[in-house]
Swiss-Prot record:
Keywords carried by this UniProt record: Cell projection, Cilium, Flagellum, Repeat
Annotated localization: Cell projection, Cilium, Flagellum
Protein's UniProt name: MORN repeat-containing protein 5
This protein's GO CC annotations: sperm flagellum
Primary location recorded for the protein, binned into one broad class: other
The keyword Transport is assigned to this record: no
Naturally occurring in which organism (per UniProt): Danio rerio (Zebrafish)
MORN repeats: 8-30, 31-53, 54-75
Length: 178
């Protein structure tokens, strides 16, 4: 297990994970809960590095039901989802704390927004480099390779770093021209 970058701290039975424990995978996602025959089985919570979590009920390693909560406390709903839709574009933190004054609008839910590396996109759980097609966590650790569908979604939907430096461009004042 350690050879693969995973670790487990918990109960064993016949050399297999069984009972309650904490299993950490190489991406630093942690499962805390019940195990049976080396698999997630029973109640458990997946804690993601970005602070979000998935609470579920598992059977033989397969999640049968669960609830996802984003790192800011927003709970995902499969139906009647009204977060950041066409009717209400506020971020969850703006819903909880109110809007900022004019001229100080938020670009992202985390405020101030993260600085995105050149040529990359902010995927919400890390940065995506379209040249390598790799998503790395905000800590720089590998998260995943993006398939064609995810690549297309990221390029169309996610916030991108600036491509070029525009520099300071003073506005001509009508008073100066007179």
């Amino acid at each position: 297990m350690e050879l693969m970058g995973s670790s487990y701290d918990g109960d064993y039975n016949n050399g297999r994970m069984e009972g309650t424990g904490e299993y950490t995978i190489p991406t630093h996602t942690r499962y805390v809960g019940e195990m049976k025959d080396g698999m997630f089985h029973g109640k458990g919570v997946l804690h993601f590095p970005n602070g979000s979590k998935y609470e579920g009920t598992w059977e033989k390693g397969i999640c049968k039901e669960g609830k996802y909560t984003f790192s800011d406390g927003l709970k995902y709903k499969e139906t009647d989802w009204d977060y950041c839709d066409g009717k209400d574009r506020r971020f969850y933190s703006e819903r909880c704390n109110g809007l900022k004054p004019a001229g100080e609008s938020q670009l992202t839910d985390p405020d101030p927004p993260r600085v995105i590396p050149d040529g990359c996109y902010d995927t919400g759980d890390g940065f995506y480099d379209p040249n390598t097609r790799v998503v790395k966590g905000y800590d720089g650790n590998f998260l995943r390779n993006a398939d064609d569908q995810e690549h297309e979604w990221i390029v169309l939907s996610c916030r991108k770093s600036l491509d070029e430096f525009t520099g300071y461009c003073p506005r001509a004042s009508t008073l100066e021209e007179k």
